Amino acid sequence: MADEVVGQEYQGNPGAFSPQQARQIFRAGTVAHTSGYSRGYAQANLITLPQEQAFDFLLFAQRNPKPCPLLGVLEAGQVSSELLADGDIRSDIPLYRVYRKGQLDSEVPDVRDVWREDLVSFIIGCSFTFETALLDNGVPVEHIAQGKNVPMYRTSIPTNSAGAFSGPMVVSMRPIPAAQVADAVRITSRYPAVHGAPVHVGDPAAIGIQDLNNPDFGEAVDIPAGTIPVFWACGVTPQSVVMESKPEFAICHAPGHMLITDARDLQYQVP
């Protein structure tokens, strides 16, 4: 089955994959950013920490629901949940980052070799989830149109610290036609579990971003004339916090390479 799915992937249309099919191809070694994959299903960020630091991070997420909206928590040593019923959190994301004392140690497609039974995993909502709603309402999503990863930036917006964890918020940016900015705000505000409405619209310097062409994570996108940069809180914030707070060990998804869950995006939509 995995070979068949990989073959389909190379023929295009990853948006038609079920979450199980997408996880299979990533488990088989395909590395790709996941924007546009498995349309209609929620995507998620991952941070995995030793159990002794798990409560501090849980408190950090509770104090910072905009960048860290929790969709689920896996207990120490647990590798699957109802969000990925047949899955394995250690192998079903296309690319992982392993941090040691705040430093990026490696970027790998599988973390089973470094897995420990004391590790607690946090599954955090991702804004890729609401991109289907934007597209269905005629709002363009430039990084998908350009075949790129979404650009992400560290900002001057502080987070609320908890225990050992503190650091700046990370945001994702999508250039939106000026006449459709209000639509983008209205549509995404209905998805609070996957970052919700933007945190900033317009001048990037106002939130500490000096150059949109030089993102801290992801890829720069061409910004069409007549568009305005719109910024959403981003679930890469925990990686920024890991780099700032320097825990002994952490596993995260590589930015833009998300966990595709079995949850429908409509489950996270509010009226």
From Swiss-Prot:
Task: Provide the E.C. number(s) assigned to this enzyme.
Answer: 4.2.1.-
Entry GO MF terms? lyase activity
Q: Which domain of life is it from?
A: Bacteria
For this UniProt record, the keywords arranged alphabetically read as follows: Lyase
Q: Which family does it belong to?
A: Belongs to the D-glutamate cyclase family.
Name of this chain's protein: Putative hydro-lyase jk0403
Q: Which organism is it from?
A: Corynebacterium jeikeium (strain K411)
